[in-house]
């Protein structure tokens, strides 16, 4: 028998590293989760490029008899068995996941989607179009289209206590999941706020894609705050109480 309210757990807390070269030697530095985000401790890099390896917060929601996964994360979490082992701690197998949500389509949120081929994937219709322009031509097919894509716009209720809302800014189709729990509303907001200071100080996101203004991104943060969440889970920082 399912409980009246949903349960929310962070399966993996975000991590982020930068790889580069300083004085001819490789450098690997941990950057997140730290707020505010420090600059990389890397001077000279490959043609001025720093290579990043990291993943987002991956969230498990259990509601109304359904197991929902928000932002499965980078491909290594699936490839090296991290996701199956973490799910097992909750008595679940990958096959027990009923629904996948992508708050947006950047690689660090979506690459392990492949583990749920054919399962329902909720994504904003504008984000689905945006995904076709990312990375390389076949990318959307490899990580998005192999699931049963459920495109939507506006607001979408997917289970008794889980609804999706538009929170554009970081990308043109960014969404957030609002979850009613016994403690109150939990907001899983993806990169609408990269770190908690973005939310608390109404800061513009680090990435604002075409056709979206910084003002739109800030309006999305105000929109989320208007729901009065008791817990906010940003994309790349630890969960916090506003």
Regions found by a protein language model. Give the residues of each.
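Metallo-beta-lactamase
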Residues: 75, 81, 88-92, 96-108, 115, 166, 172-242, ...
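Core dinuclear metal-dependent hydrolase active-site scaffold
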Residues: 10, 58-62, 68, 154-182
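Metal-dependent catalytic neighborhoods of phosphoester/phosphodiester hydrolases
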Residues: 111-117
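Short hydrophobic/aromatic-enriched beta-strand-loop microsegments
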Residues: 120-125, 187-190
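Zn-dependent metallo-beta-lactamase
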Residues: 1-66, 225-226
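Pre-active-site segment of Zn-dependent metallo-hydrolases
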Residues: 39-58, 62-99
């Amino acid at each position: 028998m399912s409980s009246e309210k949903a349960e929310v757990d962070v399966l993996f807390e975000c991590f982020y590293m930068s790889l580069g070269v300083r004085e001819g030697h490789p450098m690997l530095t941990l950057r997140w989760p730290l707020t505010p985000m420090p600059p990389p401790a890397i001077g000279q890099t490959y043609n001025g490029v720093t290579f990043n390896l990291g993943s987002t917060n991956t969230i498990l929601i259990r509601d109304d008899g359904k197991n929902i996964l928000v932002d499965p994360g980078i491909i290594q979490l699936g490839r090296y068995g991290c996701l199956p082992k973490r799910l097992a701690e909750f008595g679940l197998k990958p096959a027990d996941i009923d629904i996948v949500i992508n708050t947006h389509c950047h690689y660090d949120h979506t690459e392990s989607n492949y583990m749920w081929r054919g399962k329902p994937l909720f994504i904003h219709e504008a984000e689905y179009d945006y995904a076709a322009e990312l990375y390389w031509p076949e990318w959307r097919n490899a990580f998005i289209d192999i699931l049963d894509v459920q495109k939507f716009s506006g607001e979408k209720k997917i289970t008794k206590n889980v609804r999706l809302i538009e929170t554009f800014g970081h990308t043109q189709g960014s969404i957030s999941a609002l979850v009613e729990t016994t403690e109150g509303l939990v907001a899983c907001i993806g990169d609408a706020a990269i770190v908690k200071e973005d939310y608390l100080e109404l800061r513009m996101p680090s990435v604002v894609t075409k056709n979206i203004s910084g003002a739109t991104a800030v309006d999305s943060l105000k929109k989320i705050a208007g729901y009065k969440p008791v817990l906010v889970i940003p994309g790349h920082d630890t969960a916090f109480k506003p």
